[in-house]
Amino acid sequence: MSAQADYDAIILGAGGAGLMCAAVAGQNGRRVLLIDHADQPGKKILISGGGRCNFTNLGVAPDRYLSANPHFAKSALRRYTAQDFIALVDRHRIAWHEKTLGQLFCDGSARQIVAMLMEECAKGAVRIALGQPVRDVAHADGRFRVTHGDRTASAPSLVIATGGPSIPKMGATGFAYELARRFGLKVVEPRPALVPLTLGGEETLFRELSGVAAEVIARTGKASFREAALFTHKGLSGPAILQVSSYWRPGQPVTIDFLPSRDSGWAVAAKRERPRTHFHTLIGEAVPGRLAEVLAKRIGLWGELANLPDRKLEEAERRLSAWAFNPSGTEGFAKAEVTAGGIAAAELSSQTMEARKEPGLYAIGEGVDVTGWLGGYNFQWAWAAGWAAGQAIGGAA
């Protein structure tokens, strides 16, 4: 084993948060070592946004993040905003566009974002060790000692930025939680978030709709999202479903308004105006035909509107505006875009991300109990948390 190398900070995890933290601390004059077990940095960045990286959102606000401590993310998000990251992207002359709902994407490739962050790390003379699994972490005499590969490094500051277990095929693990617990930090039970929901046997009729999508309002508890929902061979997916999945708990129903643009009384009004129109045809004016037929069958109304009682049409309206599904579960971490739960926010300073119980230990990014909406919110949390920790380590917080 080679001799121990000394640094001011060791950062574990070269994802979005780790890269940002390393760059900021390095540019503040700190000697930084960034370690990752993967053979390339920013692997989740590279696959995000269909390869174009949905790198932030113009609508970022604290109430669009979930946490057992809902106020925790406010400070970091206020101090490093979406506009700050956009300015960084612009300085690197990366072309971008707004797609929908404030979501910003690269015109070119997600590789541009990774290259930008690597260039920022280079400006701070950050040493990056890739393909280096962490074998041991110890703490004594005010320094953290990390054994990685066949090497040992030491620093007074250690940053946990290894993410959560979502998308394990990318090498994601629960290492952050294991390390946090070792240092006495509490962990909020991790669970898949922004994840497709599965449906049980009683919903088999909907499986024939695999691949069919429609704009809906999906609700669970107090959460409500108007976006596309997609039927799959296992259940429900699409942006609206991924959004509510973060709020869903086993046993809770998910209700869907299949006709969010229709006013109350639309079916009875159509009967007066177009009595010869078939009920499933009427629904099909707002949703795909296959979905319209299945919904009409499940409701039990078929035929011309003229032959259907007003009372039945009113009941159908109510059901179509709040169709209840009882998910049997989710598709798990393998299909989850992010992880909810994680290192308890109450254990950390919201200003610096430093552990209250363990000076010099920091936690940032997906491994912390802060989970954003779909659409660039989680990357903005990564940038903001990484920036806050980097500033603190650099003495500029």
Model-derived features with residue positions:
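Glycine-rich active-site loop/strand segments that organize a redox cofactor
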Residues: G50-E98
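An anion/pyrophosphate-binding glycine-rich loop and adjacent beta-alpha core
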Residues: D39-P41, L46-I47, F55-P62, A95, ...
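N-terminal Rossmann-like FAD-binding beta1-loop-alpha1 element of flavoenzymes
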Residues: Y7-L34, A389-G394
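Short hydrophobic core segments
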Residues: I10-L12, I35, V134, A153-K169, ...
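Core beta-strand elements of the Rossmann-like FAD/NAD(P) dinucleotide-binding domain
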Residues: A5-Y7, H148-S157, F225-R226
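A glycine-rich dinucleotide-binding beta-alpha-beta segment and adjacent secondary-structure elements
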Residues: L130, V294-T371
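Glycine-rich FAD pyrophosphate-binding loop
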Residues: G26-G50
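A conserved short coil-to-beta-strand element within the FAD-binding core of flavoproteins
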Residues: L130-R143
